[in-house]
Amino acid sequence: MSARPDTPLLDTVSYPEDLRKLEPGQLRQLSDELRAEMISAVGVTGGHLGSGLGVVELTAAIHYVFNTPEDRLIWDVGHQCYPHKILTGRRDRIRTLRQGGGLSGFTKRSESEYDPFGAAHSSTSISAGLGFAVANKLKGEPGKAIAVIGDGAMSAGMAYEAMNNAEQAGNRLIVILNDNDMSIAPPVGGLSGYLARLMSSSEYLGLRSLASRMTAKVSRRVHTSLGKAEEYTKGLVTGGTLFEELGFYYVGPIDGHNLDHLIPVLENVRDAEEGPFLIHVRTVKGKGYAPAENSADKYHGVAKFDVVTGEQKKSTGGPPAYQNVFGETLAKLADSDPRICAITAAMPSGTGVDKFAKAHPDRAFDVGIAEQHGVTFAAGLAAQGMRPFAAIYSTFLQRAYDQVVHDVAIQNLPVRFAIDRAGLVGADGSTHAGSFDVTYLATLPNFVVMAAADEAELVHMTYTAAEHDSGPIAFRYPRGGGIGIDLPETPEKLEIGKGRIVKHGSKVALLSLGTRLEEAKRAADELEAKGLSTTIADMRFAKPLDTELIAQLMKNHEVVVTIEEASIGGLGAHVLTYASDEGLTDAGLKIRTMRLPDAFIEQDAPEKQYDEAGLTAPHIVDTVLKALRQNSAGVEEARA
């Protein structure tokens, strides 16, 4: 492990109030030390490195100029918040990032007063900032709201919806566009930095206000024309016309690593009577750490790594990741089916669509952080005879639920949903858990909902979805590697709504949906050792249910337990509803449902999360024994 960096100036700063005691000329040294500390910490924990390295100077400048936490600083997504955490009283815990019981990898209201709004999903910061700004305005309280949003997050419509309503906040709202992808602005140089300071100065803003009042006395047509002339002239130099149209005073672009530019611009905007402002800041993702700057992904998300070399600690060889199994299977299917296409919302490698895109680039579509558009785009493709696969994380599909209902389900369009990161996901915690998709999809008419028990089942389900043209179909699978089962050379088309018996028994029936099947197998072994003959069924489908199989198991077993890595309202609820409707519980059958608890489970290793959720083999055994009123030794307990 590398030694911790020498940080004499940073050691004197625990909170922003300490930072504000420094001289402006000391901020360069502070930023260098802050960057070194962040690299050292993430080398130990893993996490999102590149984004935070790119905003070190910006973070220091914001806390130096603004009176946080009274001025509310809101980070969009939160990938870039590690330097912010170090400067706001959490440096002593920074090496617990994303660990069980440690600091969150995102901003979190319960963690610090300097985190006024939690984040992890994209493009929410401007709306939240507007809420803070307007609330302070209505209450007559001081305080600005500063929303820092990346250029990638600006691809989502929600950001523009917020900006379109932001004028009511006046000078209380400041949006900082952190542009690190060279996708919006021309190159930054001395002229643009000079213009930014000029256009944010009180003299310029005062002159602009005076000119506006004077031109208001001429005809409306002339007044409008003069305003447009100024706007477009400035836009030619800065690229800010769009933001001006939305009612913002646009400043920039400026070099986000040049403190001599950042500090005066932020001070000018802080003191301005006009507003709202959008400050366009250009940064370099991975700034100051050569391995990150030279990497294609700028070390966006990394495992633990050697700080000196940048070499990440590779996991030992094992089964292929589920997303890669999906991507490679879909690419093979598309070789012989020109109707198959794939859609991802800014997560090509995370969903495996990158594998598909290499083979079929003309049929792979990355729509950016725009899940709503992506789903309706897929619906349009399906309506025109294509076979679209919308590959979206479970937690992000929530963002497009209206489109799933209105544009897909109601029209019964055959959109295929490949739902990655189903269940609990480990270090990213509750904001990224795929807890709810079974519940929110299986309740919809026309939908077919599947869950893969292993990587071989995922191959079959991908093929089944490709061949299913009679309506929408979804299949879910978890993060990480499979169980090591051999992949089938030829995929099998599954019969819709039919499960499979994995093990035959006579007293206890375990109905598993998804990858908890392995825990069900371990539980069955333990139950058999206690003399309890156990059947295991891999249900495969949450909807439609295999009612024939369920009825058979309920009539021939004393205890039936459903097991799923999903929230209440999923398989268990549907099985109970069916059993009630058919009177299958009238004769005293014992039914128990095991699912994720009614709580948000925080970051930890997945196996610890599932233990906390009560979804491991010992929990299954305990549930069966309690249903039979037996103790852990399998001996029947006395009844009260």
UniProtKB/Swiss-Prot annotation:
The keyword Magnesium applies. GO terms for biological process: 1-deoxy-D-xylulose 5-phosphate biosynthetic process; glyceraldehyde-3-phosphate metabolic process; terpenoid biosynthetic process; thiamine biosynthetic process. Thiamine diphosphate binds at residues 79, 120-122, 152-153, 180, 289, 371. Pathway: Metabolic intermediate biosynthesis; 1-deoxy-D-xylulose 5-phosphate biosynthesis; 1-deoxy-D-xylulose 5-phosphate from D-glyceraldehyde 3-phosphate and pyruvate: step 1/1. InterPro entries: Dxylulose-5-P_synthase, THDP-binding, Transketo_C/PFOR_II, Transketolase-like_Pyr-bd, Transketolase_C, Transketolase_CS. Mg(2+) binds at residues 151, 180. Catalyzes the acyloin condensation reaction between C atoms 2 and 3 of pyruvate and glyceraldehyde 3-phosphate to yield 1-deoxy-D-xylulose-5-phosphate (DXP). Homodimer. This is 1-deoxy-D-xylulose-5-phosphate synthase. It comes from Erythrobacter litoralis (strain HTCC2594).
